[in-house]
């Protein structure tokens, strides 16, 4: 999509780089995250108004530490360095960076002075969040110090002649209360951004671009019933109407009543026509005897492609594939070490187009999840879709430890439905970001009436998170957990023991496989 202005964020590996982009976009300022290896030709484009250098876990004084294209310092573009990014600026302009004796971690209060363009409206004191070991020992010309911490550390600096700034703290996190104001000052006061980015303008532009690209061709979209694929279908459908075919493949690995719910929800939307294919027998046959998690994922991915390809080739005039790729999918598929080293191959990035020889449409690839949700609301999607908990691509197969069978899926479906039902009744479903049940390959002794039982154990999992990069377990009330455990043990055949997972991420992941 074409943009008249943007801020480029160079990623040096910080866990909160995406927060910088989200804060700016919340202000209506479009921005993109690029790996630090990006060349100046890709950064200094006509629409680029400024550059942000993110934080990162490395030390600028270590050999081989990540550095940007040196030409960006001579580009004339405004630059704003955060933590590691500030140290890069200091090092480049001759201000020595040294290891700290103990570093600064957590809340701090800094004193502001100097350059009014970035400090505008922030007063002379600011509460911030520090997280650094190294620091700039002494600011040298042509830089000048514009803020200091109570520990005597350089908290911010600026170039005397150029629009180059750095802060040692993290303005993007909520622990820096006025951080968003600081980022706005840089983007608006220094870079001259006008802030015209909105979801209304995005939808209008996306519809025009989809129509222009597709013409009279037909488009197929793999719809899972989740937020991303459903918004994709609704957006493409708004652009081209009945030229779009949404294909839902029933793998047999979905949640209880999922197929019926998706058919009902999507069939009622004016821009979406749904074609449902029941391929559950095929998936269970391929998964028979398989217990290793990665093998399950590969089998499910391969089988899905085979089914999708079979159905797509049976349709006349289909030339395009619409995918629900969103911006975090794109970011996660490119490492901060550059294109040669991927963090992971995301299921939404690549795969199907090469096999199907279809042209790819990814209308949401510039959007974060919260922006995708806003687009869905503008397109008239119901809250049951907009605020549904995330569900993994391989479905229940990665929530069943061990072999995946139809019987075990039915058992897990029933237990999961009870958990979600009780969360909704108690008003907790919307308070937690994700909740589900895991079926263990473990049996436990129990008592039912006068009979001894020897049946499966399951795990309840509920987490709180802003971005799923880190997560903490939800502190559900004990009486709620007790009701869930009692209902599962009494109503679900094959389960006699219920546990609750209280592990955070890290060290654990949200899903068990």
Give the role of each language-model region.
Residues 1-53, 57-63, 67-68, 73-75, ...:
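RNA-binding accessory domains that recognize and position tRNA/RNA substrates
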Residues 81, 85, 90:
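Gly/Ala-rich beta-loop-alpha elbow adjacent to hydrolase catalytic centers
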Residues 323-325:
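Extended catalytic-interface subdomain
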């Amino acid at each position: 999509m074409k943009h008249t202005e943007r801020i480029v964020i160079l990623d040096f590996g910080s866990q909160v780089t995406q927060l910088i982009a989200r804060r700016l976009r919340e202000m209506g300022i479009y921005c993109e995250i690029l790996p630090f290896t990006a060349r100046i030709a890709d950064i200094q484009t006509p629409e680029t108004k400024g550059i942000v250098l993110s934080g990162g876990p490395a030390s600028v004084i270590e050999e081989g530490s990540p550095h940007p294209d040196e030409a960006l310092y001579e580009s004339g573009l405004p630059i704003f360095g955060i933590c590691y990014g500030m140290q890069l600026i200091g090092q480049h302009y001759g201000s020595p960076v040294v290891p700290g004796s103990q570093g600064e971690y957590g809340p701090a209060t800094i004193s502001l002075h100097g350059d009014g363009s970035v400090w505008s409206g922030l007063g002379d004191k600011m509460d911030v969040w520090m997280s650094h070991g190294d620091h700039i020992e002494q600011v040298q010309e042509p830089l000048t110090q514009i803020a200091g911490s109570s520990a005597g550390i350089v908290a911010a600096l600026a170039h005397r002649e150029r629009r180059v700034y750095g802060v040692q703290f993290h303005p993007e996190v909520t622990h820096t209360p006025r951080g968003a104001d600081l980022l706005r000052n840089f983007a608006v006061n220094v870079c001259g951004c006008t802030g015209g980015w909105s979801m209304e303008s995005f939808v209008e532009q996306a519809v025009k671009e989809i129509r222009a690209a597709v013409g009279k061709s037909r488009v197929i979209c793999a719809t899972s019933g989740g937020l991303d694929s459903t918004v994709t279908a609704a957006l493409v459908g708004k652009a081209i109407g009945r030229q779009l075919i949404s294909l839902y493949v029933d793998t047999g690995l979905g949640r209880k009543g999922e197929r019926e719910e998706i058919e009902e929800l999507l069939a009622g939307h004016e821009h979406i026509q749904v074609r449902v294919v029941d391929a559950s027998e095929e998936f269970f046959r391929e998964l028979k005897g398989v217990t290793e998690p990665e093998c399950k994922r590969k089998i499910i991915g391969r089988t899905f492609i085979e089914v999708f390809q079979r159905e797509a080739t049976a349709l006349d005039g289909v030339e395009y594939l619409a995918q629900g790729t969103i911006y975090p999918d794109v970011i996660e598929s490119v490492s901060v070490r550059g294109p040669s080293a991927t963090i992971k191959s995301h299921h939404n990035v690549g795969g199907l187009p090469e096999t199907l020889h279809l042209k790819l449409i990814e209308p949401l690839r510039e959007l974060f999840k919260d922006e995708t949700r806003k687009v869905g609301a503008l397109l008239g999607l119901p809250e049951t879709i907009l605020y549904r908990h995330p569900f993994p691509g391989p479905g229940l197969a990665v929530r069943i430890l061990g072999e995946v069978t139809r019987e075990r899926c039915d058992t897990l479906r029933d237990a999961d439905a009870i958990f979600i039902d009780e969360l909704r009744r108690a008003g907790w479903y919307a308070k937690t970001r994700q909740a589900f049940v895991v079926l263990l390959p473990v049996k436990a002794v129990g008592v039912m009436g006068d009979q001894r039982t020897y049946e499966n154990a399951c795990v309840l999992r509920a987490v709180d998170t802003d971005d799923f990069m880190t997560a903490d377990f939800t502190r559900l009330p004990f009486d709620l957990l007790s009701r869930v455990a009692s209902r599962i043990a009494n109503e679900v055949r094959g389960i006699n023991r219920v546990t609750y997972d209280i592990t955070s991420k890290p060290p654990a992941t949200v899903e068990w496989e």
